[in-house]
Amino acid sequence: MTKKGSSNSSKQQQQQQQIIINNNAKVDEPIIKINVNVHPNSKESSIVSFEDQILSLRISEPPIDGKANIGVIEFLSKELNIRKSNIEVGKGSKSRNKSVEIDISSENITKDELFERIKSKLNN
């Protein structure tokens, strides 16, 4: 009988550890979602505005076969100094209105710092 009791308590400990790990994972892996309005096939890629949590971009790539989506990722990566692998087009891959997800957990920046980087590019 002691074996059953000890296995149950070890299962409970494992479950508690797993819950703690899962909670820490949420804290350690923040994903910032930004609504982006994309104007593809522009003369040059640029940040137009960042108001009301909506980022407006001009992208030089055409909206054909996902080229504009790739252009968004490459442009944001270059301008914000964030790895391409940490930027993903979430919703709206075939729309001008998109949701871009940026994983800042390995970038050593906060959400506020990310937004400051975006705003600093508006002045250039």
UniProtKB/Swiss-Prot annotation:
Coiled coil: none annotated. InterPro entries: DUF167, YggU-like_sf. Residues 1-22 are annotated as: Disordered. One of its GO terms (cellular component) is cytoplasm. It comes from the Eukaryota. Belongs to the UPF0235 family. This is UPF0235 protein. It comes from Dictyostelium discoideum (Social amoeba).
